[in-house]
Amino acid sequence: MKTPPVLKRRREGVTDYRKRYRLVISRETRAVIRQTRKGLIIQLVDYVPEGDHVLVTVTNKTLKKALNIDGNNIQMYYLAGYMAAKKGISLGISGAVVDTGRAIFRKGGRIAAAIKGLIDGGLEINADEDIFPDESRLNGEHLKQRLDINEIKSKIGE
């Protein structure tokens, strides 16, 4: 018997098909969080057999155009998650499961901040409170150029 071929996306380390299968069979909207070299991408995605259907996309460029803020830190990930949740709720999405892909998830890190933003924005996501960054880090007390999170959240909510 011949060994089955290894799929290209698995060989390149892009897709974990076991994890993707478990997420897809849940039949819930996925909150896809991806880190790039210079920014982030947060998408709310539904599975259809022909291919995934992207409902909402928020990137660091979206935040820069809409709110004139820039960066690649915990505050930006939190605000991007918050904005994605608000856009998703306006489309009738109430909850999601988190899809971090092959990214290494760290307690209190940027991905955790994005999940916190999704939850604070109103999406129902099953996550433990221990993984989120402290409020002081979300408010940017560790940064030289911090953002006023509450002011920006009120702009997003409008």
UniProtKB/Swiss-Prot annotation:
Keywords: Ribonucleoprotein, Ribosomal protein, RNA-binding, rRNA-binding. InterPro entries: Rbsml_uL18_euk. The keyword Ribonucleoprotein applies. Coiled coil: none annotated. One of its GO terms (cellular component) is cytosolic large ribosomal subunit. GO terms for biological process: ribosomal large subunit assembly; translation. One of its GO terms (molecular function) is 5S rRNA binding. It holds the Pfam family Ribosomal_L5e. It comes from the Archaea. Belongs to the universal ribosomal protein uL18 family. Part of the 50S ribosomal subunit. Contacts the 5S and 23S rRNAs. HAMAP family: Ribosomal_uL18_A. This is one of the proteins that bind and probably mediate the attachment of the 5S RNA into the large ribosomal subunit, where it forms part of the central protuberance. This is Large ribosomal subunit protein uL18. The lineage of its organism: Archaea, Methanobacteriati, Thermoplasmatota, Thermoplasmata, Thermoplasmatales.
